[in-house]
Design a protein with these regions (language model features):
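PEST-like low-complexity intrinsically disordered regions enriched in Ser/Thr/Pro and acidic residues
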Residues: 57, 77, 93, 117, ...
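Glycine/small-residue-rich phosphate/adenosyl-binding loop
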Residues: 112-182
């Protein structure tokens, strides 16, 4: 029917007398669209084998349910001292595999820190970076001064929020869309987290410090 050729984002599928064929396999981005849209399940792509696909029989969410699901996402800034089990961390990160990446480039990886002392050290290093920014008369100076007053003088962990675990989403420097890909992946994780009993937030100070160093 030619639907696969129509939806192929790389425009490498053509219809021949014996059906669809790839005119440039090297240009395939492994997105799997061709396999997904085939109405008869007849298309096989070596990069997305049909026998490895698991159809998901579910009704499309109505717009109100979908809207409310997205609205319910909240940043959690008060964390319990207990560590989240590794199994749940893996479950959380599994969903990030299905987040969109530009040109299906993927190439993301994660570092999980499950050590309260290491998290505290990272928060302290971030505070030191803020002090350096203040000394350098950064445009963010006034904001950092207030933050450090809370962190240093009042002993309130406004940087890591007393969290016991951190997850860093990373990409290679040469990946020009890597940062936005990481953000998309983490958005998936944040939306999924409450369904498995977890709370998350984006540690903005730590993120900015890491990106600038």
């Amino acid at each position: 029917c030619g639907i696969c050729a129509t939806v192929c984002p790389s425009c490498i599928i053509e219809m021949g007398p014996e059906g669809p064929h790839a005119i440039s396999e090297m240009s395939c981005m492994s997105c799997g669209h061709c396999v997904a849209v085939c109405p008869t399940g007849a298309l096989h792509n070596t990069r997305c084998p049909i026998d490895e696909q698991d159809p998901i029989p579910m009704e499309t969410l109505d717009s109100k349910t979908a809207f409310n699901f997205l609205r319910m996402r909240r940043s959690i800034r008060n964390f319990k001292p207990e560590l989240v089990p590794e199994e749940k961390i893996r479950q959380l990160l599994e969903v990030t595999r299905y987040a969109p990446t530009a040109a299906n480039s993927q190439g993301l990886y994660f570092i999980v820190i499950s050590d309260k002392e290491k998290v505290r050290k990272i928060a302290d290093l971030t505070a030191q970076w803020m002090e350096e920014q203040i000394a350098a008369n950064s445009p963010r100076k006034r904001y950092f001064v207030k933050t450090l007053q809370i962190y240093r003088d009042r002993k309130v962990d406004i940087i890591a929020r007393n969290g016991s675990q951190l997850i860093f989403a990373l990409c290679r420097r040469l990946n020009t869309t890597g940062i936005s890909n990481c953000e998309q992946a983490w958005a998936y994780a944040e939306l999924y987290a409450p369904t498995i009993g977890l709370g998350t937030t984006i540690m903005g100070f730590i993120q900015t410090c890491a990106q600038e160093n």
